Design a protein with these regions (language model features):
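Extracellular/periplasmic catalytic domains that process cell-envelope and extracellular macromolecules
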Residues: 123-126, 187-189
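GT-A fold catalytic core of metal-dependent nucleotide-sugar glycosyltransferases
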Residues: 72-117, 124, 133-139
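A glycosyltransferase accessory/donor-loop signature
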Residues: 2-4, 10-15, 31, 37, ...
């Protein structure tokens, strides 16, 4: 049976979330998984515990990334030598189920599976590529060509990153629907297999008040207790202003901390 391969989109700004995701992929999957991490900050790839290797992405494309890793997911088939399957996952997620069930599911002849109608408010059929299952033998992405065509005005960056009909008119990739429970946007229910904290302004490690913030902190604290997420990881993220300053001692609300900060700020006015 083919070994499970999972690629995570990440960078220095999402190092804490990345480690949390890795911890729960390994915990909830009973077989060995090869985990590859795209570090968009350093244009490199990290496989399991091996040293990072540089990636062949031009600076032109790297500088077009919306997040640190937006374009890197399209390198996956070439990294896999156009063979076998691979999963891509954004780092701001927690895997709650056996990811092997996603990897080995029937793809029904599609080139890749992604979240259908991911952005329904836009009024257009757009695919959510933050979790994907790819048949690497069928997905032959030409990133440089895509950006040439974007600059020519054939379609936009959003069309490319969400595989809209404008993009697919030029590149007829066969995209099929992924079970949405494998990419549950800012929601948790009894069938959720992977929760995606996709709203950048309310992610629990950055802000107070997310409806499922307590869930994130429960998982975060377990990974800390097991030593997988370390104080050093957290201190570095705080120093770089990537996470909340109270992350070490926070609950999902940390009202006391923020009241203290408010009192200090008010006192500073007098």
């Amino acid at each position: 049976m083919e070994k499970i391969k999972v690629f995570i989109g990440s960078g220095e700004a999402s190092a804490v979330e990345k480690k949390l995701l890795i911890y729960y992929i390994r915990k909830n999957t009973p077989v060995e998984v090869d985990i590859y991490v795209f570090n968009g900050t350093h244009n490199s790839l990290e496989k399991n515990d091996e040293p990072p290797v540089p990636l062949n992405m031009s600076l032109r494309v790297k500088y077009k990334n919306t997040t640190e890793f937006s374009n890197y997911r399209f390198l996956i088939p070439s990294i896999c030598n156009q063979q076998g399957r691979a999963i891509f996952v954004d780092s701001d997620t927690i895997c709650l189920a056996d990811i092997g069930k996603l990897f080995h599911q029937d793809m029904n002849g599609y080139d890749l599976l992604a979240k259908k109608n991911a952005y329904v408010h836009s009024g257009e059929d757009k695919w959510g590529l933050s979790v994907m299952l790819l048949d690497c033998s069928k997905c032959k992405f030409d990133i440089e060509k895509y950006w040439d065509e974007i600059e020519e005005g054939k379609y936009g960056s959003t069309d490319y990153h969400q595989l809209t009909s404008k993009f697919l008119k030029y590149h007829p990739i066969k995209v099929g629907p992924l079970d949405p429970n494998w990419n549950d946007f800012d929601h948790y229910g009894k069938d959720t297999k992977l929760i995606h904290y996709t709203n950048l302004y309310s992610q629990p490690w950055k802000a107070v008040g997310h409806k499922y913030g307590k869930l994130w902190f429960d998982y975060f604290n377990e990974a800390r207790t097991k030593g997988f997420v370390t104080d050093e990881d957290i201190d570095k993220a705080i120093l770089r202003s990537y996470v909340r300053r109270d992350l070490k001692n926070a609950t999902h609300s940390s009202v006391k901390f923020h009241l203290k900060e408010l009192v200090k700020a008010v006192k500073g006015l007098f």
